[in-house]
A protein has these predicted regions:
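Bacterial N-terminal signal peptides that target proteins for export
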Residues: 1-10
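C-terminal motif of bacterial Sec signal peptides marking the signal peptidase cleavage site
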Residues: 19-23
């Protein structure tokens, strides 16, 4: 009888040990992950070296936002005069992506003419009569680009030149897709891109104002057209 009891006890120990091992290995399998599946195409774009590509300024824009009085609801605006010096894009190759763009600072537009042509001109250190003077131009110029590991975007290190200061920042570039317009001889590929970043206007660029927060967000939307 004792021998029978010992045999049963031994069998139970073996069963329990096997169950515990299988449970542990099953849990370990659940922990592992391969991350998001990121797919990239083969689209390429070269402005201004490709004569078939043009920058569609009418449907592009540069907007900004910052907390009013440093901590309230957002004060927003845009720049009415902007341009693209160059833009190169290779969807699957980060080394083939680079760009340079600019805005005229004195063409700020918050839908309040008195503010736009008054206190903001003083804050930026410009006048309404300026055009291509260095003090009136804010420039972004890419330095390096990496493929994002979270989505199909691109992480961009770039220089922002503004208010007499040049500082390296990091932003996010998104390829918004391509749509074909027209047909036959008038057919065009229309490309869309979004570039977003933030900067410290007071700390890094010497802006003096109690009306805005230090942190300013920028969103650039760019459209290009390519004849087929």
């Amino acid at each position: 009888m004792r021998l029978y009891n010992k045999a049963c006890l031994f069998a139970l120990v073996i069963l329990f040990s096997g169950y515990a091992y299988m449970s542990c290995t099953h849990k370990d399998a659940l922990v592992s992950t391969n991350g998001p599946k990121i797919e990239r195409g083969t689209h390429k774009l070269n402005f201004i070296t490709d004569p078939k590509v043009s920058f569609d300024k009418q449907h592009s824009n540069v907007g900004w936002e910052t907390a009013y009085l440093g901590g309230l609801s957002l004060l927003t605006g845009r720049f009415d005069t902007l341009g693209m010096t160059s833009f190169n894009f290779d969807e699957s190759n980060a080394a083939g992506i680079s760009f340079e763009a600019w805005v005229w600072v004195n063409r700020v537009n918050t839908s309040e003419p008195a503010r736009d042509k008054g206190c903001l001109q003083t804050t930026y250190g410009v006048t309404t009569s300026m055009t291509t003077e260095a003090a009136n131009i804010a420039i972004i110029k890419s330095k390096s680009v990496e493929l994002s590991t979270d989505d199909n975007g691109y992480i961009v290190k770039f220089d922002l030149t503004f208010h007499g200061v040049t500082k390296e920042l990091t932003g996010k570039l998104l390829y918004d897709g391509t749509i074909v317009t027209g047909s036959g001889a008038t057919a065009k590929n229309v490309y869309g891109f979004t570039f977003t970043f933030q900067f410290l206007a007071k700390t890094d660029f010497g802006i003096v104002s109690t009306n805005i927060a230090d942190l300013v967000g920028i969103k650039c939307n760019a459209i290009f057209r390519q004849t087929q």
